[in-house]
């Protein structure tokens, strides 16, 4: 048995206590039972408690004809409760899973609306947590997936909070009946071709019939697994700290790790550390695709192996693991002559270059390595550029992007490489700032 519905306001306020200092609480309001109860609870609390500014957001997917009436319903409910409402229309991208595509579009809208120190509140409850655990178990999820929905996580510039995870659906229904609330029944929630609906309507009733406390037990298991995941995260932090000594190429802005520090770990600790490191950068591979990491790890020292993932690539080069995405995966285009040497020159798909100190005599232009370049070094004569790059252990993926400064056919400088990046006698150096495009998920 859950706690009586009359206790819901105090439980909700207790769960939201850590976020009372937020600038804004925004309710993800679909118009369904869960979010309707959450909205009503918070609107009532706002009358006698000091809580942040309150509003709601309704995301309209337009996936079914019935949904066209939902924004008006949500607007009427919000007006009755004196809560401002934002209706956000989104386009759902076609794909194999309509459920996932709609969720992605919805959370993209939520993320865009969540500003610094804002909190987005969603209405998932304990029954949802149990379904999530079972659904992910059937998909072969690991500890992180089986830990269920977190009570809070980062979203946009603020936070997403699920304050009803300790509340049952039965409690929400009782509260709604007691207060005469009206809510939307989404017809798609009855469509059992969707996996979650099948679990909810076909499987869960059988489990509850045999084990009445199944929802509570599964939610408790998810909590245990969250604790276990926390320990794995702590272990990953220890291992990543050992592998996070700075490289000679910090100016690249690329996330990187010392390869040897990762390779010496057990296979399980390697996967744990890399999963933790890669999670903010890319969608993680499933178990079957971790063979790509084994190929990178076990390649010979003279190789430059690459593991291609959903949102970028993991490279092994110069004794390190490097994460590349965005412009780093596009071939830079030659920019032509550099006319105003006093200003930085923007390079298509490759950041910008600039001088410090004096500026050399022009005309000058930037090229990229093609092979066969030679550089005249004071006291050393003519030296092959490939050998000079080898001496400095420049990663292979950097070599094709390094801006080379030419006067006519004479190679004057290689940006950012000490001893090659300028002329001490003439008092100038060439600096390259690679693109600061986000290295990670958006």
Curated annotation (Swiss-Prot):
Per the annotation, which location comes first and is thus the protein's main one?
A: cytoplasm
Ligase is among the record's keywords = yes
- Binding positions for ATP? 30-35
Which GO cellular component terms, listed alphabetically, does the Swiss-Prot or TrEMBL entry include? cytoplasm
Q: What processes does the entry annotate via GO biological process terms? A: tRNA modification
Report disulfide bridges, numbered on this chain. Answer: none
Q: Which UniProt keywords apply?
A: ATP-binding, Cytoplasm, Ligase, Nucleotide-binding, tRNA processing
Q: Which reaction does it catalyse?
A: cytidine(34) in tRNA(Ile2) + L-lysine + ATP = lysidine(34) in tRNA(Ile2) + AMP + diphosphate + H(+)
> What exactly does this protein do?
Ligates lysine onto the cytidine present at position 34 of the AUA codon-specific tRNA(Ile) that contains the anticodon CAU, in an ATP-dependent manner. Cytidine is converted to lysidine, thus changing the amino acid specificity of the tRNA from methionine to isoleucine.
Family of the protein in this entry? Belongs to the tRNA(Ile)-lysidine synthase family.
Q: What is this protein called?
A: tRNA(Ile)-lysidine synthase
Organism, by scientific name, is Pseudomonas fluorescens (strain Pf0-1)
What broad taxonomic lineage does this protein's source fall under? Bacteria, Pseudomonadati, Pseudomonadota, Gammaproteobacteria, Pseudomonadales
């Amino acid at each position: 048995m859950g706690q009586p519905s009359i206790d819901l306001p105090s439980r909700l306020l207790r769960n939201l206590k850590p976020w009372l200092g937020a600038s804004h609480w925004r309710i993800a309001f679909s118009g369904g039972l869960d979010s309707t109860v959450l909205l009503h609870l918070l609107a009532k609390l706002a009358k006698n408690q000091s809580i942040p500014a309150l509003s709601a957001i309704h995301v309209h997917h337009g996936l079914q004809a019935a949904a066209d009436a939902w924004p008006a319903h949500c607007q009427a409910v919000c007006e009755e409760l004196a809560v401002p409402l934002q209706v956000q229309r989104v386009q759902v991208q076609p794909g194999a899973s309509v459920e996932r595509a709609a969720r992605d579009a919805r959370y993209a809208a939520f993320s865009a609306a969540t500003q610094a120190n804002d909190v987005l509140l969603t209405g998932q409850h304990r029954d949802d947590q149990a379904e999530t655990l079972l659904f992910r178990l059937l998909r072969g999820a690991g500890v992180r997936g089986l830990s269920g929905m977190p009570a809070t996580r980062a979203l946009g510039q603020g936070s997403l909070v699920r304050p009803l995870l300790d509340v049952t659906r039965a409690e929400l229904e009782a509260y709604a009946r007691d207060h005469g609330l009206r809510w939307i029944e989404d017809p798609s929630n009855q469509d059992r071709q969707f996996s979650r609906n099948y679990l909810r309507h076909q499987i869960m009733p059988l489990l509850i019939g045999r084990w009445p406390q199944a929802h509570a037990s599964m939610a408790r298991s998810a909590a245990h697994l969250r604790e276990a995941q926390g320990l794995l995260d702590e272990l990953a932090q220890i291992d990543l700290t050992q592998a996070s000594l700075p490289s000679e190429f910090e100016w690249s802005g690329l996330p990187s790790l010392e390869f040897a520090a990762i390779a010496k770990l057990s296979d399980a600790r390697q996967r744990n550390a890399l999963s933790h490191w890669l999670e903010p950068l890319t969608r993680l591979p499933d178990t079957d695709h971790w063979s790509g990491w084994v190929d990178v790890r076990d390649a010979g020292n003279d190789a430059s192996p690459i593991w291609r993932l959903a949102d970028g690539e993991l490279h092994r080069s110069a004794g390190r693991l490097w994460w590349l995405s965005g412009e780093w995966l596009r071939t830079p285009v030659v920019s032509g002559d550099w006319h105003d040497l006093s200003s930085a020159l923007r390079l298509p798909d490759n950041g910008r270059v600039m001088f410090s100190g004096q500026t050399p005599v022009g005309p000058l232009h930037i090229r990229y390595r093609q092979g066969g370049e030679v550089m005249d070094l004071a006291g050393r004569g003519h030296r092959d550029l490939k050998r000079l790059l080898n001496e400095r252990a420049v990663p292979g993926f950097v070599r094709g992007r390094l801006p080379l400064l030419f006067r006519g056919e004479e190679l004057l400088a290689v940006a950012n490489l000490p001893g090659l990046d300028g002329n001490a006698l003439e008092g100038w150096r060439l600096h390259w700032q690679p693109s600061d495009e986000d290295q990670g998920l958006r």
